[in-house]
């Protein structure tokens, strides 16, 4: 791209951002963005966070419209917590492989086969699965919430089996796991990670607990996106191999500009291990959804009513 073309592109983006901000102000709209969104979306968001932080913000804001820059289950959660608000998802096809791994009809059958179990569902699931759950959790609070469940209760944990195994190990509780997983966190290369560790002596490996066990045992710190951010801010190392969606690195570099953050390649050797769904949202689509007041999240009122209970229970137990 020539320097003239670059200048034009920057100017077009500046104009786009300016119009988005102006329309948000007029519509009393708030932009919520997950850490896995593209840097330019993170920069215009009114609030950036992990699933737990975003849930809290969705439940407590004065906006009339929530523009959720994340994926479908996140926007659904915002609608459940703020049913009287308009919730817009810039790209309605921004789904989640993990949520897709747990269809509500099959999950209902799984529950019926285990009727004496307390159902804990990771927030990365559909509204219909949330409505069948006793408690929702995030990767930030899963261990602490599981520890609060009476020991005489048997527990189902769904839909992420990798997170479930990590929670099981750290909580000391036996969990009946649903066999789901995230395409991003499943595809990191152990061989590439070992090579990077050898090439970067003194570095540390930080991982999201959705990663598979063979990667977690090689990690120096495991935690949710917000906890990974906290760790790199407090830790004294200078270089980190990052085993989660690379969108988080934008915030890591902002917090610690003098530290190095290395994306771990996937099994095909590509340093492009991005969530294809998260990256469907763009500035253009944000502007379009503001102009058209769509795509909006619509849920059955009964699903909202039932799904609200385990989400609210999570928020209350997390305080």
Outline where the language-model segments fall.
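Active-site loop-to-helix "anion-binding N-cap" substructures in soluble metabolic enzymes
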Residues: 1-242, 249, 253-319
């Amino acid at each position: 791209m020539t320097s003239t073309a670059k200048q034009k592109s920057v100017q077009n983006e500046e104009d786009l951002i300016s119009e988005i901000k102006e329309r948000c102000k007029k519509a009393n709209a708030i932009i919520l963005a997950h850490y896995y969104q593209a840097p330019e979306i993170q920069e215009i968001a009114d609030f950036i966070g992990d699933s737990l932080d975003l849930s809290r913000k969705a439940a407590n804001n004065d906006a009339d419209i929530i523009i959720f820059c994340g994926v479908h289950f996140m926007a659904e959660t915002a609608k459940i917590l703020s049913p009287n608000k308009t919730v817009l998802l810039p790209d309605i096809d921004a789904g989640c492989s993990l949520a897709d791994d747990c269809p509500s009809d099959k999950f209902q059958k799984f529950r019926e086969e285990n009727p004496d179990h307390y159902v804990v569902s990771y927030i990365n699931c559909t509204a219909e699965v949330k409505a069948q759950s006793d408690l929702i959790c995030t990767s930030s609070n899963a261990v602490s919430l599981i520890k609060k469940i009476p020991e005489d209760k048997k527990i189902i944990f769904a839909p992420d089996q990798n997170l479930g195994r990590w929670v099981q190990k750290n909580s000391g509780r036996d969990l009946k796991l649903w066999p789901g997983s995230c395409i991003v966190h499943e595809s990191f290369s152990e061989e590439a990670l070992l090579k990077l560790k050898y090439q970067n002596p003194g570095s540390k490996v930080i991982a999201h607990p959705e990663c598979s066990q063979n990667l977690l045992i090689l990690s120096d710190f495991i935690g949710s996106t917000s906890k990974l951010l906290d760790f790199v801010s407090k830790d004294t190392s200078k270089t980190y191999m990052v085993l989660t969606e690379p969108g988080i690195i934008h915030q890591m570099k902002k917090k610690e500009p003098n530290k190095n953050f290395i994306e771990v390649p996937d099994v095909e050797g590509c340093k492009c291990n991005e969530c294809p769904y998260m990256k469907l949202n763009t500035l253009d689509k944000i502007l379009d959804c503001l102009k058209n007041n769509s795509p909006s999240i619509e849920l059955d009122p009964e699903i909202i009513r039932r799904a609200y209970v385990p989400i609210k229970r999570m928020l209350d137990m997390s305080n």
